[in-house]
């Protein structure tokens, strides 16, 4: 199971070259090593960012939307797309057994202090007794999955998935806007939602997709 990838939006804006190299080289190195050492199956943990811009439809596994290749922020979705293609190319050329998982936004109790994903920011605000700080309108609509459910789905795909196929990981009961997430978090600790202007680095790291809802 290859799940090693830096998913920090701040890292995307500051180190786009390293993001591309790590996503591509990681898959290449592991598949090459695995084939030399009797690998039975390889599962690549990709991302829903491969879907690109939404046209309003729910993201099914065969959907492919626009990604601006001239934007450094596209280092992440573009390299994840290329890494998926590399996986199936290894299958086609060398007979590797590969499956791909595309988790939606995953949340859980264990994250680093410098994690700047939106749910982590909200939880830190709540634990400190602060108002919940939003740095956008919060209209972005997302699918979410609890980390334990995501891990279970990854194992299921590894064992039961069809070679060369990609599978969404999502919970249709957990689709919510960023604004709603902020309001729920604020209500749990008796605080309010406030707006703050993001700095330039934060803005560059934001996912431009306004609606990211997965089929299940």
List where the protein language model places each region.
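Small-residue (primarily alanine) positions within well-ordered alpha-helices
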Residues: 4-5, 34, 83, 153
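A conserved pocket-lining segment of Rossmann-fold NAD(P)-dependent short-chain dehydrogenase/reductase
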Residues: 12-13, 65-71, 98-110, 121-145, ...
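Catalytic helix-loop patch of NAD(P)-dependent Rossmann-fold dehydrogenases
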Residues: 14-32, 36, 40-41, 50-101, ...
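Generic structural signal for alpha-helix termini and adjacent loop/cap motifs
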Residues: 6, 15, 33, 37, ...
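Hydrophobic alpha-helix immediately C-terminal to the catalytic Tyr-X-X-X-Lys motif of short-chain
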Residues: 82, 86, 90, 122, ...
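Conserved NAD(P)H cofactor-binding loop of Rossmann-fold oxidoreductase domains
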Residues: 3-7, 46-47
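C-terminal substrate-binding subdomain of Rossmann-fold SDR/epimerase-dehydratase oxidoreductases
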Residues: 126-216
